[in-house]
Amino acid sequence: MAGLLAAFMLNIGFAKKTPVTLVIVLLLSIPLAGCVNDESDLGEITTVSMTIYHGYSIDNATSNHTIEIELYSGIAPSHVDSFVKHVNAGMYNNTTIHRVIDDFMIQGGDFENGDGTGGYAADWYGYCNGQGLDNVSNCTSPTYYTLPDEADNGWVHTSCKISMAKTSQPNTGGSQFFLIPGDISQHTWLDGIHTVFGEVVTGCEHITTLSEVQTDGYDRPILPVIIVSATVVANSE
């Protein structure tokens, strides 16, 4: 893709209950300077086990998958804190992977509407719909809580990474996330914009399999892809 002008439209939702379209223009497929995964200070590592099925029900699923994701508080403390709080509250259980694009990613985490228009941060991190506010009382509802961007952490969008979905505006990440398949080298146009906050350490081949399911014209799986459960299984420094 080097030297070619390519446009990519990424439909993602955030705290406002309307879909948002992010248009990313890729001029050159060249990695950002200095954007290499730095494992020198991962901080506390939280391991989340996630069970996912593809089909109309778990009993009649065409496939069942279990993956483990390591989350690194040292590279994206707010993102990890929010994600873990959502996991512990059961917010991701029985939610949809609402968007699937082969050779790109699978996206879920909209526990409000299940279609990419909902979700929010698990706590107050200083932003309300992307606007920095001094006081939480100035944000009209917890459903408008969003995350500060932590995309300058040196981690890039290579295979098996987990990253936070957001709009084209800064600091608008909430609860929606996307997982990058194992057959991808790097999505350079996302680096420095979306925050990578961990990686799939077990079962990344399942992300690749799920990224290849049949979808409709809106990138929605024809047969549902459902996160049955997400559970914290380990913590370590």
Where in the sequence are the language-model features?
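Secretory targeting signatures
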Residues: 1-42
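Cross-family detector of peptidyl-prolyl cis-trans isomerase
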Residues: 35-237
